[in-house]
Every structure is written in C-alpha cells, then in structure tokens.
Amino acid sequence: MAMMTMIDVLERKDWENPVVSNWNRLPMHTPMDLLEKQSLNGLWNFDHFSRISDVPKNWLELTESKTEIIVPSNWQIEFKDKSDVPIYTNVTYPIPIQPPYVPEANPVGAYSRYFDITKEWLESGHVHLTFEGVGSAFHFWLNGEYGGYSEDSRLPAEFDISNLAKEGQNCLKVLVFRWSKVTYFEDQDMWRMSGIFRSVNLQWLPDNYLLDFSIKTDLDEDLDFANVKLQAYAKNIDDACLEFKLYDDEQLIGECHGFDAEIGVVNPKLWSDEIPYLYRLELTLMDRSGAVFHKETKKIGIRKIAIEKGQLKINGKALLVRGVNKHEFTPEHGYVVSEEVMIKDIKLMKEHNFNAVRCSHYPNDSRWYELCDEYGLYVMDEANIETHGMTPMNRLTNDPTYLPLMSERVTRMVMRDRNHPSIIIWSLGNESGYGSNHQALYDWCKSFDSSRPVHYEGGDDASRGATDATDIICPMYARVDSPSINAPYSLKTWMGVAGENRPLILCEYAHDMGNSLGGFGKYWQAFREIDRLQGGFIWDWVDQGLLKDGNYAYGGDFGDKPNDRQFSLNGLVFPNRQAKPALREAKYWQQYYQFELEKTPLGQVFAFTVTNEYLFRSTDNEKLCYQLINGLEVLWENELILNMPAGGSMRIDLSELPIDGTDNLFLNIQVKTIEKCNLLESDFEVAHQQFVLQEKINFTDRIDSNEEITLFEDEELLTVRSAKQKFIFNKSNGNLSRWLDEKGNEKLLHELSEQFTRAPLDNDIGVSEVEHIDPNAWLERWKGIGFYELKTLLKTMIIQATENEVIISVQTDYEAKGKIAFSTIREYHIFRNGELLLKVDFKRNIEFPEPARIGLSLQLAEKAENVTYFGLGPDENYPDRRGASLFGQWNLRITDMTTPYIFPSENGLRMETRELNYDRLKVRAMGQSFAFNLSPYSQNQLAKKGHWHLLEEEAGTWLNIDGFHMGVGGDDSWSPSVAQEYLLTKGNYHYEVSFKLT
C-alpha cells in the first residue's frame, strides 16, 4: 500500500465504503502514559478545498500552504470560509440521505507539518503516531509515503510509523474529510464541525513493550476482601516477564508476577463518587535479569457495580443518579476542551450536587475520565453512534452491513476506557432505533465485561428505552405521572408493568432550554419515594453557543442550512460556564441533606430533623447553621458541627425559639463545608432549606394627609391631584397614562396597562425544527387566538369622589378576533397621601387558551442602580421553579434582575413579593403577594429580538407586576409541558397592589 499514489488512495473512496473503517490502524488499548512522547500540537500548515477533486495531484510534493491553523481545533472556527461553516442541526442530517454516499462537494482540510525524530528513537524501538480525535475521516502520509486511514471522530487512531519515519526532519501530511459514511452514524444534537480537534502526538516504544492491560476488582459479598486481577499483553512476551505492584498511597500492599495475576486486598478502601479513593498500580515489563523494558502506573479504584432486586447498586448501596448530559464544547474552540475547562465543569457539578455524567453522545477525551476517577463522578460512557435522522431510525442499525462499523465504535470504546472506576455503565449509543446490531453489541458487552450494566434507549416509539439491549429502563423525557410525546409510559406507569423489574434511570429529562426546568422538583419527589426510580440525566450541561464577532451564535447565524435555530441552547450553564438560575434549582432538589420540621398537634414548632443522603460519607467536614429571621433581620441563630453517619439523621431541638406570633418568621437552615475539600471551598453552602413559620402581609396604616384631593376632567383625560402629585387617566381605555410627582416630573414613560402575554419562552415556542410549526405550542395558540393583538374595549368608567379619596372604576373587555377573551374591572383608589391602590377583578372566557400572565405593565421614568424587595430571591423564580428560592428582603443591582438568555424571552420574575422599592416608588401587596420583574427591555422587544446582544436598552425601566403567572415548564421543550396546577385555568382572579412615592 505504501507504493500507492495519493490519487490511487483517493480513488478508492474509503470514506464511502461500508466495510472499510481503517487502514493500518493499531488495535485499541488502555492509554499508556509513561512512555516518552512528543506533542505535535501547535501551528500546522493548512489548505482548505471545497471538494476532494480540488486537492492538487501533487499536493504531497508541495511545501507551502496558504495559511496556518492551530491543532487541535475545528477548521470552521479557525479558518473562516462562508462555503464551509459550522452547522447546527438536531435531527436533520446536514447532507442528503444516501448512505454510504456523501456529496461530491465534500470540504477537505489539508494539514501538514514538520517534526524531528532522533536517531535514538529509530534505532532502539518503535515510533507510534496517535490522532486523539479527527472528524470525520482522514488519510495521512509521512515523508510522501502512505501511512493509513481512520474513522470515528471521538476515539484515538494509532499507527506504527517506524518504517516511514527517518532521522531528523519528517513531513506529515493529513487529508481530513468533512463528510464520510460515518456522518450517518454521528448525527448527534450538536454543531457539525470537522478537523483535527484533539491532540496529536508521537510516542516512542521499546522493542519489548506493553500492548494492553486490563484491571478488574472483584469484591466479595461483604465487601471486605477484593481480588485485583490483572491481565496484560506485551510485544515479544517470550523474552519478558511482568511485575505487578499495588500501592496504597506510598505503602506497598501487594505484588505478584505474570501476565495473568491477582492481588488480594483485605478491607479495601472502596471507590465512589463520594470518596473517590484510588490505589496506584505499578506494572514493570523486564527481561529475565531485571532490566526494565517498559514501566506504567495506573490509578485504580476498587468498587462493585451490580443490579440487585431491581436497583442499580454501587458497593451494595442503591444509587440515586444526580446526572447531567454533557457535550464536549467551548464557545471559543468548539469541540476542543482544555483540562482547565474540564476541571471547572467538574467543580461546578460537584458544587451543585451532581454525581453522574452521561458522555452524550460519544466517548470523551481520555483526560476527562481520569479527572472523574480523581474527583469522583459516575460516568455513562457512550459509543459514538446516532442515526436520529434516518427513517426508520433503525434503517442502518438493523442492517448487518454496518455491524462491523458499529462494533468497532463500541468495542474500541470499551477497550480504551475499561480500567476507569468512574465508568459504571456502557451505552451503545443514542437515538438509533433498535436493530439486530444493537443486540449483538449488547451481547458482546455482557460477555466481555460482566461487571458493568449496559444502557441503550433507542429514541423511537417502539423501544421506549426498554429493549432487550439494555439492563436499565432508560426513557427520554418521560413525565412522572402522565404520558408524553417521547414516552407513552409515565414513570409511575413503568413501575406497574407486569414482569418488569429493571431499574429506571432517565437517560434524558428536564430539558433546560432557555428559561426552563419548571416542575423539576416533582421528579425528585418521585425518585425519593419509589425505589426503582433511580434518577436521571438532565439535558444538558452547557449552552452550545459559539462565539461569533464576540457574541454567542446559534443555528442559522453562520448561514448554515439546515439548522435548528436556538435548540443548541439547552444548558444549565451559559457557554462561558456562568450558572443559570436553573442550575441552582437543580442543586436544591438534588442536595444530599433533607430537612423535616416537627410540630405539635397545635402547630407549634419544636424541632427539625436533618437526614444525610450520602451512601458512604459520614459528615466529617460539615457544619449546620440555622437562623430565625423575620425577613429583615436575624432574630436568633445557632451553629453546630454535623455528626451523622451515611444515611443517618440528626434531630435539632427548637423549643427555645423566640416565636411571638406577630411577625413574618422564617427558619433558614444551611449546611456548609468547614475546610476546603475535593474542589469545594471552605464555608461553601452544600444544602439549604427555609421553613415558613409565620407568614403575614403587614398592612402599614395609611398615613393621612391634610392635602386636598381634587379632580379635573375633560373629554379625553381625567386628572386627580393628591399630595401635590397628578394622576392622569386616559378616558379612552381607563389606563393611568401619566403620573407627575410634586415637582412636576414624569414618573411614567408608558402608561400603566394590563398585560396577559409574555415574551415567549422556548418552551412556549415548542418544536425545534425550523420548517415545522406545532399548533399545540403555547405561542401558536396565543398567536392564533389573537392574544398578542388584543383590542381594548372600554365598557364603563365610573368616578366617585369623597373627602379622603377618589375611586375610579373601569370595566374593560379585551377582544380577540371578534370574541371577548378577557374582562376586567379595575378599581383605582387615590388617597390624600398620594397613594394609589389598584384592585383588579379578572374574568376569562374559558373557551380560550389560558393566558401567560394576569398583570400590569408600566414603563417607569427612573433608571436606578439598585432595587430592594421583600419576596422570593435572590434568583429569578417562577411558580413551578421556586424550590431554591428564599423569602427575605433582597437588595440587588438592577443588572441582577435580568437573566441574559442568549435567545431573549420573559425572564427575571420574582414571586411572592410583599413590597418593592425602586428609586422613590414603593409597590406593596394588599391581601396577597404579587410577582414582578424589572428590566431595561420591554416584553415587546424581548419577543422580537433573536439575540440578547441585539437588545437595545430603552429609556427608564420596564416594570411588570403580575397577580398571577403561569409556570415555565421543562419536562421537554417541544410539547406543552407546564403542569396543570401551574396554568391559569380558573375563570376568575383577583389581586390588589398599592403604588406610592416615598
């Protein structure tokens, strides 16, 4: 093959041949870390060609390129060509569906670089070249000679180049194809990009070297004795022997010799996410005299994974998966993720009570698994197989032609990663239907590695996450107690299926697209109540927003077609890893400490209990802080060191609490770290709870005034003068159109009007696919019925004046396409002290869809820096996403009152507000609390602009006050997912608020 010309190689079209996955690639093995390496990362010469036929026939002889490119990278980011851009699509293939064939217009990245090899390397052993990740397929040549070919963008490709390399300078050339037959198997929900995006390195190996080794840790039933079993393979084994040593820290605890050996460990320290204890294994390949050929060390964890009595168990304890799906993604570099970012992700996950990650939907960089071993995260390792855009979805996965291709993707993943204790589940891929190939791969996994369960969901209605090719029922987006588009069975229905006793772990749930994650707590209530419901993996970790001109881009922003718009933005964190409010909501529901308040039959509080949900960790670094507050100040507080075993509880006496029955009273509880430990800083809050002991809306006595209250009226306006202020009403619609303070300054830039819509959330918009509109989506229903174009019909405006107040009663109908959708009666009470009390009675036509909100909107003239309110905070919160929020008085910057979702929408709401103070304006709840948001952007602008960075700051500040607001939903983002109890279904509503200048 080395004698073949480049044209000969390219004319074979290996990238379209179903039975060719590589040429000359070495078998996969566990990574070898101690052999001498030379990195080839850095600047490479680079040429871009629009199609393979454009590559010059003499390219191998060319010594210059048009440009340079950083390796690792995606060339669509580094090399900007409008004909070859990042493409974001969820399901739809980016190329016509004609497997195994790809378009003739197939962009090519032509890479080349020079490197030196020493004489010692060539004379004393072997030289291997490894590409850790290249997409989607590539050929390479060294010094003009053909080297090899490989596919599978997410696993290493290693080649022995000893016969091609030479002493001194060597020239490496690589042709990378954007599309290949494997494009049909890599149809994941992500940006489609290409290039050499993981490291490239050279490795020197002696003549005698370790080819591979496998470590298994078998524990007895009592978990007090482990056999650490080693099976190793070496080059030239006849001339070598293997020494095997096991260390606990620096203490040697066992050693043996042989390529198939084992060491017994008494009372082993077990690995788990909570206590990720690692032993050090040392392997030494030597000759008979003891001269060392090859030495490797590997950190190993001793642990046991099993499914027993319908539950997935780790070291004998039933696991509750606090998981998240994670793509390899950074906004600056696409698929390239540095170790620094990996550690940052793990730190954030640990801080927010995550214990598991699904590598969606492909094997990650090897370093990721090492870090998960070290810091403690359970991993579902997933094969790089997804055929979501196929019809039927199993068109390829049920075709035996593609079994070898699929087999390599599963078996090579397992062979590389099998020695990591963090990996507790193998996954056969994602959303590829269910075919005979899956069953073959499942059978292979179970025969090769019986120590781990196998997962496969399937993605189509027929499989529902419960085929014979999975040990775990693993539906997507199943709801707790009702069916959904993706999951005909609810979680509770699954628990009643006759003859079914597998554990259920949601491979994807709680789709966090934009302002989402509503109803998340309902899942966790079910997980804690039902033993076989063992958690799940949220979709997903990070917004896939690529940087373009300094701003975050989503599908279509590069002119990419097809595209699925902002469906790439589903993360709990923004692309820069800044937390969204939903992340803190997830932290709250997943927290490892649960609290229960104890009361007498008469309702008197006398104690609370804290329970430790850790399976293995005693509380050795936690303190309990608890306070009695009235929302404004701390009335009483205490702190103690927590002392609980794993799974234990502790009761805290509260009989001495100073409760007098006259004020708002809240019991705030926090669990904090004492010392810095395993990425968590000292004094870091790991759990919190607030109990409302007494709840009162305090009505401050209205301060009377000697000021005369007067009334002026003409054909268009009604003016009330009170406390030297003017309240001017528009008689055509009954709205407060102007408000002048005692100095004549305008307080309003836009009239106080009623509001029933919101800038649509992604969950309101619905489906991901651009070309398809779902008539059941909330936005389509609201638009279709005319809610965004309501016609205001003033029915009556009645004015009553007394010595102390003016009452203006306004009856209004709101017409949608010729029918009355809503009717309201607004009763304005203006008192002599300048206070405006507004009482609103709302009635809806129940034949119409429920509104998003029932409230008010006004544009204040003020633009203050800070806001103070008494209500739920500090983050935004909504009726179905408020678990993490606390009652209290919050003093925040106005910039903290908005959440900058990349795709703008309704945001920043604060629920259960009793009082709001902004500049001179005081808004008080009367009878019940209200919700509000303050923003420099109107709902109208938020609805119209497609990107946050395109929003234009408006004059003053927009204030929205809601008596009632529907939930945000989040079970999924393509079907209406707001639970019934969070919809505004009633026919009548009433709320009251008071406005006053201070």
From Swiss-Prot:
Pfam families: Bgal_small_N, Glyco_hydro_2, Glyco_hydro_2_C, Glyco_hydro_2_N, LacZ_4. GO terms for biological process: lactose catabolic process. The active site is at 431 (proton donor), 508 (nucleophile). Its EC number is 3.2.1.23. SUPFAM superfamilies: (Trans)glycosidases (SSF51445), beta-Galactosidase/glucuronidase domain (SSF49303), Galactose mutarotase-like (SSF74650), Galactose-binding domain-like (SSF49785). InterPro entries: B-gal_small/dom_5, Bact_Beta-galactosidase, Beta-gal/glucu_dom_sf, Gal_mutarotase_sf_dom, Galactose-bd-like_sf, GH-type_carb-bd, Glyco_hydro_2, Glyco_hydro_2_AS. It is an enzyme of class 3 (hydrolase). GO terms for cellular component: beta-galactosidase complex. The keyword Hydrolase applies. The keyword Coiled coil does not apply. Transmembrane segments: none annotated. PROSITE patterns: GLYCOSYL_HYDROL_F2_1, GLYCOSYL_HYDROL_F2_2. GO terms for molecular function: beta-galactosidase activity; carbohydrate binding. It catalyses: Hydrolysis of terminal non-reducing beta-D-galactose residues in beta-D-galactosides. Gene3D superfamilies: 2.70.98.10, Galactose-binding domain-like, Glycosidases, Immunoglobulins. Changing residue 34 to F: In strain: ATCC 7962. Changing residue 702 to K: In strain: ATCC 7962. Keywords: Glycosidase, Hydrolase. Belongs to the glycosyl hydrolase 2 family. This is Beta-galactosidase. The gene is lacZ.
